[in-house]
């Protein structure tokens, strides 16, 4: 995990952040040897899952407690291509503790440390039984508060 990061204009400082390395495999690419555009949401998911895990929030345990986090929206900006066998650094971060919406921003850097892709995924705290949006439960907020004040 990298604790420092330069802010882009209009961004708040992240309170949760984690970098994950992903090597582009053959199945991630198209016939031209570049990462297929539809692969990036999977990279985002791997990175945000690892970020939440780093801070002690494990999806499986969240689901066992009756909450799910479906994707409400995803926005992706493609700046440069990534290639087969390239090692990418995928950085996910949150700028605020979520009440209902988890807004997770993601940046992908190539092996030359150039920003090649960035975007945002919005997850909604949802009651697993009813399928309705819910406020993040106290246990989750307490966990997030404790790690945000510790960093």
Located regions from the model:
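Hot-dog-fold acyl-thioester-processing enzymes
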Residues: 2-73, 127-151
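A short, structured loop/turn motif at beta-sheet edges
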Residues: 11-13, 110-114
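Generic short beta-strand
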Residues: 26, 106-108, 123
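Conserved GNAT-family N-acetyltransferase fold
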Residues: 44, 106, 119
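Hydrophobic beta-strand-centered segment that forms part of the acyl-chain substrate-binding groove
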Residues: 51-102, 116, 124
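A structural signal for beta-strand boundary/capping segments at domain termini and interdomain linkers
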Residues: 115-116, 133
């Amino acid at each position: 995990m990298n604790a420092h990061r330069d802010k882009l204009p209009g961004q708040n400082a992240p309170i949760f952040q984690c970098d994950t390395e992903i090597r582009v495999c053959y199945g991630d690419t198209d016939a031209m040897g570049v990462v297929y555009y539809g692969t990036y949401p999977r990279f985002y998911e791997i990175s945000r899952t690892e970020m939440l895990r780093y801070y002690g929030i494990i999806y499986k345990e969240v689901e066992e407690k009756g909450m799910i986090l479906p994707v409400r929206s995803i926005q992706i900006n493609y700046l440069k291509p990534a290639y087969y066998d390239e090692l990418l650094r995928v950085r996910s971060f949150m700028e605020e503790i979520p009440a209902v919406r988890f807004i997770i921003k993601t940046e992908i850097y190539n092996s030359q440390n150039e920003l090649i892709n960035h975007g945002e995924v919005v997850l909604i705290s949802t009651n697993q039984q009813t399928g309705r949006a819910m406020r993040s439960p106290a246990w989750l907020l307490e966990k997030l508060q404790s790690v945000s004040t510790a960093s």
